[in-house]
Amino acid sequence: MAIVLDTPVAVRRAAMDLLARREHGRAELSRKLRQRGASAELIDPALDRLAEEGLLDESRYLESFIASRARSGHGPLRIREELAQRGLPRADIERALGACEVDWSAQLREVWRRKFARLPQDAREKAQQGRFLAYRGYSMESISRLLNGRSDD
């Protein structure tokens, strides 16, 4: 039997259930509650209250998301785009990426080492490695520096 989200208490409970599993951004949480049948008139006050209580925190969500994606080997460009697609303000994304303590160049080298382990021998290999690293979200400048054998340390 589906849970009906037609009261403030039901909406709050559903939101807290989602937040208990992992951090969510306000836009993402609102979207999930709407998908479950809650109205905007019930969602907005519930999310406002959760934010006041510190249970819904965009900065904590950003920090958690960035750390998770960085551990998975994703670069700042891909992380930035994923967060923007989730409805977060660009200024908040930039602030969070600037505050994170990830050494992106070291991470780029580690991702490259795990996948390829040797510098490209020809233009085809170089293009292949470059495409892979660009897809993972690293800048072309950093990729070029790495694939040309120059260190940016």
From Swiss-Prot:
This is Regulatory protein RecX. Pfam families: RecX_HTH1 (PF21982), RecX_HTH2 (PF02631), RecX_HTH3 (PF21981). Modulates RecA activity. NCBIfam families: PRK00117.2-1 (NF001054). One of its GO terms (biological process) is regulation of DNA repair. The keyword Cytoplasm applies. It is found in: Cytoplasm. Belongs to the RecX family. The lineage of its organism: Bacteria, Pseudomonadati, Pseudomonadota, Gammaproteobacteria, Pseudomonadales.
